[in-house]
Each structure stands twice: as C-alpha cells, then as structure tokens.
C-alpha cells in the first residue's frame, strides 16, 4: 500500500492536540494551528512515513522481525488485526515491565502458556476438578491476554512499531536500552526522543491508526515477498549454473 496525502487528510492524520499541551520538540513537524489545535505538516509526515516503511521492507526482506505495540483502547483491535495479517508479533493489551529487557523470564511464561494450550488440546483439562478447571481457565486467559501476541516470538524483535509513544513510554525505554530501533507515531503532545523513525501525526483517531498499521503490515508483507522472490531467483540461477556445468561435462 502506497500512502497518499489525500488518504492522510481523510484519516485526519494532520489533527494534533490542543496547543496548550504541545511538546516543543515536535515544533519542526507542526504546520500551524486552527481553533487552538495544532496542525501537523503532512508533507513531513508523508516523507517520514515512507522512510519508515522502506526500512520495514528492507528489514523483513532480510528476515527481520517487527513487534507491533499499541495498547490504548482505539489501537488494540487494529494492531492485533494488522499484525496477524502480516504474521508479526504484537502487544495490544498491557505492556509488562521487562517484556524486552527481561525476555528470559517472559519466555518462561510463554512456555507455560504453550503448555497450557497443549493441555486443552490433548484433553488433560477434562481430568481436572471443576475448581481446578476454573483456575486453569482464568490463568490461561490472563496469559493469553498479555502474551498471546508474542508466543511465537523466538527472541527479541529486530525493531518495534509503536502507536502513541507517550502511552507506550515503558516499551520505548526498554527498546532504547537494548538498541532496538523504534518506528513510532508521535503526536504533537509527545517527545520523539528514543524513536529512530518518527511518524508525526494523530495517534487518537482510529482511522489514522488503521492507516499507519495497514501501511506497516503491507510493507512487512512486501519485504517478505521480496525475500521469497530473491530465493526463487537465486535457485533459478543455481539451476542454470548446474545445467551449464552438466552440458560442459557432456561436451
């Protein structure tokens, strides 16, 4: 998906926050104000979003993993849907402290979740008492809510895509500590500090959030497809080389 200026206008990407809540570090990306609301300069946003998507394409073409993060109410369902569509890990409920910096411990909880899911599939759950089964279901639901989106993630992600960097401050701090690049949607009331690829824009409108997340998911799918195509081309090239050798040997 190639994002256009018109699409951004229709999604309300240009609407920032009230001027009294602004963060001066976002000044370079602000076009002006209307009715005491800052207006984001979409010419900057378009260029910066495309740079972020190019980065995502290159990363996933090289088999990199991008973690989607968006736990605010407006973003939860959208983040989950788009991450699932492109096969990316995601966090759309509460960000658990240490999710990145203490991934070894988190991995143990993921293993517990996977073991519990196996118990459901193999019928072990049927052997539990009513109280045990109820406790089991509660724990399973809790683990699924917090870790379900990252249960297939084998290690730390190569990058992180974040909706609303202010709301996800803990995630940004952890990524920064570990040197994990962040692609982040930054509204006029937040600081772009710690964000490698800043996408200035509205982080409250569900239409705007859908536009960012869909564009990122498309870029990931394009990158993966590019990787597959390169493997196919390399395979064809190898076959041609081998075929040429066989013909030479037979001559």
From Swiss-Prot:
Disulfide bonds: none annotated. GO terms for molecular function: structural constituent of ribosome. GO terms for biological process: translation. GO terms for cellular component: cytosolic small ribosomal subunit. InterPro entries: Ribosomal_uS2, Ribosomal_uS2_bac/mit/plastid, Ribosomal_uS2_CS, Ribosomal_uS2_flav_dom_sf. Keywords: Ribonucleoprotein, Ribosomal protein. It holds the Pfam family Ribosomal_S2. The keyword Chloroplast does not apply. NCBIfam families: rpsB_bact. Belongs to the universal ribosomal protein uS2 family. PANTHER family: 30S RIBOSOMAL PROTEIN S2 PROKARYOTIC AND ORGANELLAR, SMALL RIBOSOMAL SUBUNIT PROTEIN US2M. This is Small ribosomal subunit protein uS2. It comes from Nitrosomonas europaea (strain ATCC 19718 / CIP 103999 / KCTC 2705 / NBRC 14298). The lineage of its organism: Bacteria, Pseudomonadati, Pseudomonadota, Betaproteobacteria, Nitrosomonadales. The gene is rpsB.
